[in-house]
């Protein structure tokens, strides 16, 4: 296979096709259905998903919940305004954060948020400029304070404020720790999930805490040189068993989102099968890399030259993926986190 370059994954996207808010209701988003068997493209609506699934199929969703991790505070005693974005828990109440203005927040800097019932102290600055910060609060959990003072860390291309923070959570989100939503799951409603279960489609959960590295552009010209960011994942005993049983019975395992996909493929690559496990993964799926677990994928339309469009190309084929994206632009699909979905089966 020839060396793949970043520019191979470029496509032209008119700005107005970048969705600024989610579809309402959630399952009213459009769904492009791509067949791996005959290369056909169908244009549907997300709530039509049951038409393409069969009893025995297993959907694997990522139950990670987004932290309202962007908090604006004032430095003590100067009163200068600053912002922290919590990236990941280091230990206890110490978090790795992105700080603005970073240069002015050296170790020992104290910051106060809201009514002062949440404070933070900068412990140290890392090589990449990120800070280790310890938080102090008067509630049982830090999350209660973030809920009170924090905002959702929306991707940079979404400029509209959310009417409701829950619009950026999946309906099944429960494990706190993501810096961005696993967006393919935003299209599911409780009713649609009930319909799927009633027809014999299984729904199993994994956890992968999405890091902001998700939005980090690929810098290298040759994509195989790109180093992926690391993210924490976990697969339970029950989910592992259901996946093994689905495969053994000859049914399909369909990942809901690139994060579920990467979780399953990381575990399969590491252990040779899916078993209960947790750890960090920096798996990078791009054309030429073999898939060992999933049979299908539900995902949104991703940024040009992103690792996510590379993942889709790895599963569906490079030429076919880029063609599908051209069709999506021509058909005026909505793109990125709040946009429409694609089903590859």
Regions inferred by a protein language model and the residue ranges of each:
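Surface-exposed, charge/polar-rich loops and edge strands
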Residues: 2-345
